[in-house]
């Protein structure tokens, strides 16, 4: 069995976090700076 190459070079694994963190800023004025974790959000 042969392993496939990573989807993104130099990233050993990917984490998907399905949490509406944008709502924290809009509703509660709490800004969660997730840049340290390289978390990308969408516009929804």
UniProtKB/Swiss-Prot annotation:
GO terms for biological process: carbohydrate metabolic process; hyaluronan catabolic process. Its EC number is 3.2.1.35. Optimum pH is 5.5. It catalyses: Random hydrolysis of (1->4)-linkages between N-acetyl-beta-D-glucosamine and D-glucuronate residues in hyaluronate. InterPro entries: Aldolase_TIM, Glycoside_hydrolase_SF, Hyaluronidase. Expressed by the venom gland. GO terms for molecular function: hyalurononglucosaminidase activity. Keywords: Disulfide bond, Glycoprotein, Glycosidase, Hydrolase, Secreted. Optimum temperature is 37 degrees Celsius. Contains disulfide bonds. It is found in: Secreted. GO terms for cellular component: cytoplasmic vesicle; extracellular region. It comes from the Eukaryota. Belongs to the glycosyl hydrolase 56 family. PANTHER family: HYALURONIDASE (PTHR11769:SF9). Snake venom endo-hyaluronidase that degrades hyaluronan to smaller oligosaccharide fragments. In venom, it is not toxic by itself, but increases the diffusion of other venom proteins such as crotoxin (a neurotoxic and myotoxic PLA2) by degrading the extracellular matrix. In addition, it displays antiedematogenic activity, since it significantly diminishes the oedematogenic activity of crotoxin (probably by direct substrate hydrolysis, since hyaluronan possesses strong water-binding capacity). Monomer. This is Hyaluronidase CdtHya1. It comes from Crotalus durissus terrificus (South American rattlesnake).
């Amino acid at each position: 069995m042969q392993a496939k190459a990573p989807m993104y070079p130099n990233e050993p694994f990917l984490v998907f976090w399905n949490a509406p963190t944008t709502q924290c800023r809009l509703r509660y004025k709490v800004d969660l700076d997730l840049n340290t974790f390289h978390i990308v959000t969408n516009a929804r």
